[in-house]
Amino acid sequence: MPQLQKPAPAFAGTAVVNGVFKDIKLSDYKGKYLVLFFYPLDFTFVCPTEIIAFSESAAEFRKINCEVIGCSTDSQFTHLAWINTPRKQGGLGSMDIPLLADKSMKVARDYGVLDEETGIPFRGLFIIDDKQNLRQITVNDLPVGRSVEETLRLVQAFQYTDKYGEVCPANWKPGQKTMVADPTKSKEYFETTS
């Protein structure tokens, strides 16, 4: 099972990137933050809502030096067929993020999200920092999708703590107060709360 503050499990495979097959690997993203999210299956129900939402927000992630990759145990051919299916028919349409094919199930297994009985991954989401260490891990059961806004906020918060060495309180957003992780200095933050 992957651990926070430790190197993310290396991966490599074929993805659909801008409508074509391309080999990608974790090390391609060194120097950038990366959101790697797993979803159960192509041509399903909750999955397209998440993938489309991440794709539509890809530019926001790129503005903060972060890329996003979706991954399932489907083949790259199935990914491409789903991308080429119109959204009004349950397809994805044009994508602004890569969809990684994990037909061998190795990536999902290495990240600890594979349901061994069904061969499909749970909805795992991993934030990997610019040094390729894991900073955040969440895993949802199959019927509930994830929040793109919360994922973006978490990346921003980790980047802030990396840069300034301060900690971010609950519900922190860029521009809001942070605190120094020190019993005395943290009081400056708490004095401003009600």
Curated annotation (Swiss-Prot):
GO molecular function: peroxiredoxin activity; thioredoxin peroxidase activity; thioredoxin-dependent peroxiredoxin activity
GO cellular-component term (any): cytosol
Highest taxon, organism lineage: Eukaryota
Disruption phenotype: Results in reduced resistance to oxidative stress. Simultaneous knockout of Urm1 restores normal sensitivity to oxidative stress.
Modified residues (Phosphoserine): S194
Primary residence: cytoplasm
Protein keywords: Antioxidant, Cytoplasm, Disulfide bond, Oxidoreductase, Peroxidase, Phosphoprotein, Redox-active center, Ubl conjugation
Domain Thioredoxin: 2-160
Post-translational modification: The enzyme can be inactivated by further oxidation of the cysteine sulfenic acid (C(P)-SOH) to sulphinic acid (C(P)-SO2H) instead of its condensation to a disulfide bond. It can be reactivated by forming a transient disulfide bond with sulfiredoxin SRXN1, which reduces the cysteine sulfinic acid in an ATP- and Mg-dependent manner. Conjugated to URM1, a ubiquitin-like protein.
Record function comment: Thiol-specific peroxidase that catalyzes the reduction of hydrogen peroxide and organic hydroperoxides to water and alcohols, respectively. Plays a role in cell protection against oxidative stress by detoxifying peroxides and as sensor of hydrogen peroxide-mediated signaling events. Might participate in the signaling cascades of growth factors and tumor necrosis factor-alpha by regulating the intracellular concentrations of H(2)O(2). Reduces an intramolecular disulfide bond in GDPD5 that gates the ability to GDPD5 to drive postmitotic motor neuron differentiation.
Subunit (UniProt): Homodimer; disulfide-linked, upon oxidation. 5 homodimers assemble to form a ring-like decamer. Also exists as a monomer.
Anything else known: The active site is a conserved redox-active cysteine residue, the peroxidatic cysteine (C(P)), which makes the nucleophilic attack on the peroxide substrate. The peroxide oxidizes the C(P)-SH to cysteine sulfenic acid (C(P)-SOH), which then reacts with another cysteine residue, the resolving cysteine (C(R)), to form a disulfide bridge. The disulfide is subsequently reduced by an appropriate electron donor to complete the catalytic cycle. In this typical 2-Cys peroxiredoxin, C(R) is provided by the other dimeric subunit to form an intersubunit disulfide.
Name of the protein in its database record: Peroxiredoxin 2
Gene: Prx2
